[in-house]
C-alpha cells in the first residue's frame, strides 16, 4: 500500500465502538504550531479500546488507503479485449476506490485476454501494473485533506521536490528545510531479459524479445533472465513487457537515500 498508519488517539467520549468507526473515512492532520503542514486521509481498517483514566478514553486506530480494500476480495475472472485502464477502473470502482486517476505517458494496448486466477483483486492489479510498467502513489493536496491514488508509467508524473541545502549538523535545530544525510549505493543485478511466448493464431511467430540493462557499472553481462511464457500475444506487448521487466529487475541497481528535517 502507499501507506499504513497506526494511531493512538484520546477522546472525552467513552462510547466509541467498532461499528461506529470501522471503514469510516479518517484524516490525520500534522501541525506545526497552528499551521497544518500535511493531511493524510484513509479508511479505518482496525479499531481498539485501550486505557480509561476516568476523564479520557484512549483508542487505537489502524488507517489504510482505500486501495487496501482490494486485498479483501479473491476471484476467478477473465477480461477480454480490455486495456489496463479499463481493467483497473472495473476493480477499483467495485472496491470503492473512487478517487484515482491514470497518468500515462505511454500507450497501453488492450490485451486479447487477461485472467485473474484465484488472486485477490490487489494481487491481480499489482501483477498487471508491474507487467505494464506502472507504479502507484497517493497524490496529496498541499492545503486540504484531498488526495488521489495515481497510476503512472513515467517519473515525469512525479512532483518536483525542489532544491534544498545540505547541512550535516543535526545537533542544532535548523530553521529552514535542509538535507542532513545523503547516501549512494550500487548493486549487481540481472543484466538482461529475454522473453518468449506463443500464439496458436500464428504458429510460426517467434515471439522472442530481448532487453539489455543500462548503467551496468562494470558488472558482468552474463546474468540473463529468460521468461516463458511472457504473457503477451503481439509484438507491442512483447517489447513493452520485456522492457518493463528489465527496468523492474534493475530498479535498485543504483539507489540514493537521504534524510531531512
Task: For the regions a language model picked out, list residue spans one by one.
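Amphipathic alpha-helical and helix-coil boundary elements used as assembly
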Residues: 1-261
Amino acid at each position: 500500500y502507499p501507506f499504513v498508519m497506526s494511531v493512538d488517539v484520546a477522546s472525552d467520549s467513552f462510547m466509541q465502538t467498532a461499528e461506529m468507526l470501522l471503514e469510516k473515512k479518517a484524516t490525520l492532520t500534522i501541525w506545526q504550531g497552528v499551521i497544518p503542514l500535511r493531511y493524510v486521509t484513509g479508511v479505518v481498517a482496525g479499531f481498539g479500546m485501550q486505557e480509561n483514566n476516568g476523564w479520557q478514553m484512549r483508542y487505537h486506530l489502524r488507517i489504510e488507503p482505500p486501495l487496501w480494500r482490494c486485498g479483501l476480495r479473491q476471484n476467478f475472472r477473465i477480461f477480454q479485449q480490455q486495456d489496463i485502464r479499463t481493467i483497473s477502473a472495473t476493480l477499483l470502482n467495485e472496491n470503492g476506490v473512487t478517487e484515482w486517476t491514470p497518468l500515462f505517458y505511454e500507450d497501453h494496448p488492450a490485451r486479447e485476454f487477461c485472467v485473474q486466477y484465484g488472486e485477490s483483486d490487489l494481487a491481480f492489479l499489482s501483477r498487471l501494473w508491474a507487467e505494464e510498467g506502472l507504479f502507484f502513489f497517493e497524490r496529496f493536496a498541499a492545503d486540504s485533506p484531498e488526495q488521489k491514488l495515481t497510476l503512472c508509467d513515467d517519473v515525469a508524473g512525479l512532483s518536483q521536490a525542489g532544491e534544498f541545502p545540505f547541512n550535516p549538523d543535526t545537533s542544532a535545530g535548523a530553521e529552514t528545510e535542509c538535507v542532513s544525510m545523503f547516501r549512494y549505493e550500487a548493486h549487481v543485478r540481472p543484466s538482461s531479459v529475454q522473453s518468449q511466448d506463443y500464439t496458436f493464431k500464428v504458429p510460426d511467430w517467434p515471439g522472442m524479445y530481448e532487453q539489455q540493462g543500462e548503467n551496468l557499472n562494470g558488472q558482468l553481462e552474463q546474468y540473463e533472465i529468460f521468461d516463458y511464457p511472457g504473457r503477451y500475444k503481439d509484438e507491442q506487448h512483447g517489447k513493452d513487457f520485456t522492457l518493463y521487466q528489465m527496468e523492474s529487475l534493475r530498479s535498485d541497481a543504483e539507489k540514493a537515500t537521504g534524510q531531512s528535517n
